[in-house]
Amino acid sequence: MKDRLQELKQRTKEIELSRDSHVSTTETEEQGVFLQQAVIYEREPVAERHLHEIQKLQESINNLADNVQKFGQQQKSLVASMRRFSLLKRESTVTKEVKIQAEYINRSLNDLVKEVKKSEVENGPSSVVTRILKSQHAAMFCHFQQIMFIYNDTIAAKQEKCKTFILRQLEVAGKEMSEEDVNDMLHQGKWEVFNESLLTEINITKAQLSEIEQRHKELVNLENQIKDLRDLFIQLSLLVEEQGESINNIEMTVNSTKEYVNNTKEKFGLAVKYKKRNPCRVLCCWCCPCCSSK
């Protein structure tokens, strides 16, 4: 019998060399494919102008929050005594500033919505600039909405204080009136309380009359402020309805992306598992046809 041990050893070495060469070639090919599928970051246009406008708008919202807080602190000092003209003048200045700032911020937020739609058309809804503008608008809009709610609650509380003070002063003077009567007089503008005939009839002092008149003026100013706030809240409600669908779409996109990533991870795991079980990658015998052919 012919001794073929040396031939077997030589054949085994050739198979090992062929297998190592095949593995290195496969890894190189896989690495090449992976590099082609690597994440390539988009070159987004520079958004310096948008960032500058957003920063400016954020500063305006912060200033509005400071003025609303200042207005609320002034209302805490509301007492039954006669208020000085300087305090009333200062309060009137603050309310005017709040109104001007709120209208400016509302217009700026509307302009930002237009910029978002423009960016969606030019750069696409998934571009970096579009996503930055959307997130910034949502954050600033919520902040602005909270500030206006606080301002509205402060005005409503002040209105109730003024009505309570007028009722108390009339009660002290001997003129009993219900809160509904005061509300009707306020809405209808029939303030016969301030006539000289009533002053003589109930023996009300001029100081008390002056105080009631002052509260009446404050109530009238509050009515005008509430009307302005109502217009702003109507515009805010329209913005909420318009942006609500966009927020829902963003949430659905994020959830679908999360599910897609999880599915991709599972597929990669299965791919690695099947790769290890590939019969062409494992040598069962040195004379395997698939290996010898290579």
Swiss-Prot record:
Residues 209-271 form the t-SNARE coiled-coil homology domain. The keyword Cytoplasm applies. It is a peripheral membrane protein. CDD domains: SynN. One of its GO terms (biological process) is synaptic vesicle fusion to presynaptic active zone membrane. It holds the Pfam family Syntaxin. It is found in: Cell membrane; Cytoplasm. Its main location: membrane. This is Syntaxin-19.
